[in-house]
Amino acid sequence: MKTKFVVEKSPPLKGTVKISGAKNSVLPIIAASLLSSDEVILEDIPSLEDVNVMIELIKNFGALCELDNGKLKIKVDIKDVEAPYELVKKMRASFLVMGPILAKLGHAKISMPGGCAIGARPIDLHLKGFQSLGADITIGHGYVEARAKKLTGKKIYLDFPSVGATENIMMAAVFADGVTVIENAAEEPEIVDLANFLNKMGANIKGAGTDTIRIEGVKELKGAEHTVIPDRIEAGTFMVAAAMTGGNVLIENVIVDHVRSVIAKLTECGVKITEEKGGLRVKGVKNYKAVDIKTLPYPGFPTDMQAQMMAMMTVAKGTSVIIETVFENRFMHVSELKRMGANIKIEGRSAMITGVDHLTGAEVKATDLRAGAALVLAGLIAEGRTEINDIYHVDRGYVKMEEKLRALGAKIYRK
């Protein structure tokens, strides 16, 4: 098993890159397929470890899955209510099966989730939502169990616009009696994609993409065909790669509205970004400017792009401040970037980055998915050779990242 990336200073990236289907869209959509009584066909499924885990998880419940060349066929006949630790420990998104199983069978038992080590990321908002709908929740021996004879629509206010909680409650509510209203709901494009898929199956959901989502309960959901939206974080990552290396790259299969905040920040740096028929063209500039960033829930600047932008800021002209408001403990890439010569100071949830002349290659490790991506980007511009360990994190969220970069002229390979 090749466990590290070796990256050498690369020429400006040039060419075209096609963005894969969105990981953060496909995981809840696969979970939602458990609600259907007929066959579901999903297209543009990214070939990722997290997706394989989610497929294994729904197979555990009795789903029949056939994945071929990005097309996933799912037939559901739920035989079990329990999701075991072996599967759930691999990623947090496993918990998204709780809403559908509870809605379909009135009983779900899911192991407490694992996944990326980013701060607390509690599931309490999910559980409060299920309780509001009438479920009894018990927690013990590492499992969460939910039971309900019948779920009933309610008004649910989320203390924080959590994406996972919004999705899980939305799925749990599709069969509930009456109307469920989620207030302070997350507005991410992935929520809209999930709602569109549920509606294709026969759900009655309005307001996805706003802070108030209204779900009118229905009796059953039928089969549907759906193409997953492109991955806005992968798109953003390749936009930054093109910008940092002074390249000229066409990003294909991107929904421009989904990356507006990234476009705004890169443009502020001096990068030239234009919409073309095939997608977005990103042209880097020499001596780009430092910019300040504050991560926020969508449509604000995504926390999932914070590490990549920090890598870019390490050699920008001037000083930038990055404030992380979404997740705690999300500066784990800082110590690794410092090993490469970056000048970064951390104070609480703020990072101050003073641009240096150049980074130097070093041996570093990916501590999580986006940290790994940031180190790959830093390696592209660092003098000499960078070795990035623990790249299994990167494989959880990027389809063949090194192959896509190599096709643009990057010097990167697995070892």
From Swiss-Prot:
One of its GO terms (molecular function) is UDP-N-acetylglucosamine 1-carboxyvinyltransferase activity. Its EC number is 2.5.1.7. SUPFAM superfamilies: EPT/RTPC-like. InterPro entries: Enolpyruvate_Tfrase_dom, Enolpyruvate_Tfrase_sf, MurA_subfamily, RNA3'P_cycl/enolpyr_Trfase_a/b, UDP_GlcNAc_COvinyl_MurA. One of its GO terms (biological process) is cell division. The keyword Cell division applies. It catalyses: phosphoenolpyruvate + UDP-N-acetyl-alpha-D-glucosamine = UDP-N-acetyl-3-O-(1-carboxyvinyl)-alpha-D-glucosamine + phosphate. Phosphoenolpyruvate binds at residues 23-24. Belongs to the EPSP synthase family. MurA subfamily. This is UDP-N-acetylglucosamine 1-carboxyvinyltransferase 1.
